[in-house]
Amino acid sequence: MAAAGGGATRGARMLAERIRAERKVLEGAARETSRKNAPTIVYLRELKSQVVREDPELVLVNKPHGLPVHGGPTVERSVASLLPALAKHHFGWKAEPLKLCHRLDRDTTGALILARTTEAAERVQQALREREVHRVYWALCLGTPSPREGILDIPIMEKETSGPQKHYKMALSPRFRVSEEGAVERVRVPRSAHEAVTRYRTLGAASGASLVELHPITGVKHQLRVHLALGLNCPILGDHKYSHWGRLAPQKPPDSVLRALGLTVPQARTLSLHLHAVQLTLPSSDGSTPIVLQCPLPYTFRKTLRKLRIPPPDLESLQPPPTD
């Protein structure tokens, strides 16, 4: 009878832990729903509080997670929709609306350049087209890249996945493959594939995760996420899209990461994408010293690093733009 009682106690304890885990998942979903239903003024105040730097031509915003840059049929609020009000609240009621200079994915945080004039916006956009803007990202990944530093030069294209849950994702389109005999063969890259080049280096690793610095040379959709997940087998923490190829499912981090973060598998569904645009370097309008714009890591990102026992980097540790 004692053994049966002990088993019942363990069963009750496991049930209680499962209920607590499911409650936390529901609470996280409720917070996200509450944020989505918040009045516009809440989004406006949040965006205004994230203005990192400004001058007569440009404004640098540390974009928060979950706020899309552009609107759409299913998007109620975006950075673009807030720009007229942001300009008036920040610079006065006679201020002209700010202009978007580039994109940043909804779930990516960090440096977003806004222009105060049309001329400044066009100048930044031209520099981006001519690859004169150097971008640096920090990503918290599952696993550790091997090698720890290098260059990924693998084209990317959109493909339809196989399996019962067919959908479209960006995917690698390698120039080479290994034959059954072990020989390296060159393959023809489809015309729909885009050149994609990323420099990377590992800044620190612990608890089954690593902090990686990324220097994208090109700007293909989801380039960093695809290169890390499919090129290095190190998906970004919270990347529920590219952690699985043929199915739509939440990311399942390894046990070592879950233990360090104090999470269960159900709770890991609410993890946000840990990808941050930390620095943008662009040419100055008068041809003098380049303009370096930096945005510190958000609190949630730094909190995750502490739990994983990965030392948080400082902005001074950033490598300078490559000269080649």
From Swiss-Prot:
State the disulfide connectivity.
none
Main location (coarse class) = mitochondrion
- Per UniProt, the enzyme's principal EC class comes to isomerase
Protein's GO biological process: mRNA processing; pseudouridine synthesis; RNA splicing; rRNA processing; tRNA processing
Pfam families per the UniProt record, alphabetical: PseudoU_synth_2 (PF00849)
The subcellular location is: Mitochondrion matrix; Nucleus; Cytoplasm
- What Gene Ontology molecular function terms does this protein carry? RNA binding; tRNA pseudouridine synthase activity
Query: Gene3D superfamilies this protein is in?
Result: Pseudouridine synthase
Annotated organelle transit peptide span: 1-11
- Any one cellular component term from GO for this entry? nucleus
Enzyme Commission identifier(s): 5.4.99.-
**tRNA processing keyword on record:** yes
Catalyzed chemical reaction(s): uridine in 5S rRNA = pseudouridine in 5S rRNA; a uridine in tRNA = a pseudouridine in tRNA; a uridine in mRNA = a pseudouridine in mRNA
Q: Which residues form the active site?
A: D105
Q: Which UniProt keywords apply?
A: Cytoplasm, Isomerase, Mitochondrion, mRNA processing, mRNA splicing, Nucleus, rRNA processing, Transit peptide, tRNA processing
Reported function:
Catalyzes uridine to pseudouridine isomerization (pseudouridylation) of different mitochondrial RNA substrates. Acts on position 1397 in 16S mitochondrial ribosomal RNA (16S mt-rRNA). This modification is required for the assembly of 16S mt-rRNA into a functional mitochondrial ribosome. Acts on position 39 in mitochondrial tRNA(Phe). Also catalyzes pseudouridylation of mRNAs in nucleus: acts as a regulator of pre-mRNA splicing by mediating pseudouridylation of pre-mRNAs at locations associated with alternatively spliced regions.
Q: Which family does it belong to?
A: Belongs to the pseudouridine synthase RluA family.
Protein name listed in UniProt:
Pseudouridylate synthase RPUSD4, mitochondrial
Q: Which organism is it from?
A: Xenopus tropicalis
